[in-house]
Amino acid sequence: MPMLPPVANALKRSETGAEETSEQDAVKRTKVLDMAQKVTRQIISSANAPGAIGPYSQAVRAGNTIYLSGSLGLDPKTGDLKEGVVEQTHQSLKNLGEVLKAAGADYGNVVKTTVLLQNIADFAAVNEVYGQYFKSPYPARAAYQVAALPKGGLVEIEAVAIAGEIEEVKN
């Protein structure tokens, strides 16, 4: 019998529990699994946010999930960093907002962010600005101090969002 992916191996037995032996059945099953696993991929970009400064996209939508690359506090018109961590945080989040808009989403669609800080002592100042863009229920988040950020940035924020209408479920 041909080697199948782990998911297909789990489906190797018939409803009665007897193992299927037909190679044709295995091929059919593999084709069905391949069709179920296909996901559309779309590159998202906005002229209203700074272009990528390396070989990557501003965002990629895979199925209903939108992955936004890290955003520095760069002015989209000049490419210059804003002054100070507060202004860089505002600009980083504005840039993310423009890319979200290009994807047909907004801050309410964001489910996860990662905040990279050049200095963890800026955590409170970044939180103050962050709370102006994201409202409760807040996205999941991680924040880290890093040794350095591109272009001498003080903060970089990346995000993951879900396309479409979000229905909140109360616990």
Curated annotation (Swiss-Prot):
Start and end residues of each stretch annotated as Disordered: 1-25
Pfam family, one: Ribonuc_L-PSP
Name used for this protein in its record: RutC family protein C23G10.2
Source organism superkingdom: Eukaryota
The family this protein is said to belong to: Belongs to the RutC family.
Molecular function via GO: deaminase activity
SS bonds (residue pairs): none
GO biological process: mRNA catabolic process; negative regulation of translation
Cross-referenced InterPro entries: RidA (IPR006056), RidA_CS (IPR019897), RutC-like_sf (IPR035959), YjgF/YER057c/UK114 (IPR006175)
GO CC, any one term: mitochondrion
NCBIfam families reported for this sequence: Rid family detoxifying hydrolase
Entry-linked Gene3D superfamilies: RutC-like
Organism of this sequence: Caenorhabditis elegans
